[in-house]
């Protein structure tokens, strides 16, 4: 047991928190960071200027509490999402993790179950634990896919009260077809399950990929969560949001902290939404780099998964940790997600992507046994 865990063990922690470690990817000082799926292109200059101006204006009123209902921001988010959504359908918080936490606070808790399908976003079980919600680990196919029949059966078998569907899935990058969402929703009727479709990376999906937003009408237990951390390059600003039936957003108001969304955060998000053309242009370039990575990994004899995100999950590695370390030694940090034979890399700028591909190929050429 580590010293940190020993110190924690001396405190009167809740039982379900004992032995746990805080969530977090390695934060290392290396030239090329491709490990946490950030938008590697940064904030364009004109968007920076708009944010600076908006925050300066907000600063003049920082002695007052912010708009508790963040009305203007909800209007802008509804307009951005489209699909006939109104501000009453929108909720936002400090990152999509806080949105998910608020959903669990409202609909989870002692005696209730949340179902996820690993490998998937590693925060789901931590959020469940933090709200005393039992986390049930479902199963995927051998290729990490999830089909409608299997997913629906697992919802019925577990009697889950909350279901997490990550699309595109993290860490695999693969999207879910909407028939899976529909089947899961119908299967959750008996337990009145809240179905969350986590679309944090949806803007990076291939053209004409449908969103679960199209399924919201008539489905009051369906929630679609999004974030401005990825496509909008605002990971440092912390703004996540969701779309759902108005009664669901009203339920979230029961558990939110007062004035939870600062005036600075609201101003930043609004400025980015109002100047999103440049940001979406960067998204298109990131998609080009992602597809380039897939093509090059295939050429190297590796096994990349089809990706609708800003990262690529790839297998075919006998010793992924050694490859990870070799890349780190070359100044490139990617993610070892703990899945045998696999690693995950964020699509970088063109020079960053080139550096990753060249370093990886050099490692593979010099250490052939690492290829399975």
UniProtKB/Swiss-Prot annotation:
GO molecular function: histidinol-phosphate transaminase activity; pyridoxal phosphate binding
Residues bearing PTM N6-(pyridoxal phosphate)lysine: 230
Pfam family, one: Aminotran_1_2
Top EC class for this record: transferase
InterPro entries: Aminotrans_II_pyridoxalP_BS (IPR001917), Aminotransferase_I/II_large (IPR004839), HisP_aminotrans (IPR005861), PyrdxlP-dep_Trfase (IPR015424), PyrdxlP-dep_Trfase_major (IPR015421), PyrdxlP-dep_Trfase_small (IPR015422)
Pathway: Amino-acid biosynthesis; L-histidine biosynthesis; L-histidine from 5-phospho-alpha-D-ribose 1-diphosphate: step 7/9
Disulfide cross-links: none
Record protein name field: Histidinol-phosphate aminotransferase
NCBIfam families listed in its UniProt record: hisC, PRK03317.1
Superkingdom of the source species: Bacteria
PANTHER family (UniProt xref): HISTIDINOL-PHOSPHATE AMINOTRANSFERASE, HISTIDINOL-PHOSPHATE AMINOTRANSFERASE-RELATED
EC number: 2.6.1.9
GO biological process, one term: L-histidine biosynthetic process
Cofactor names: pyridoxal 5'-phosphate
The gene coding this protein: hisC
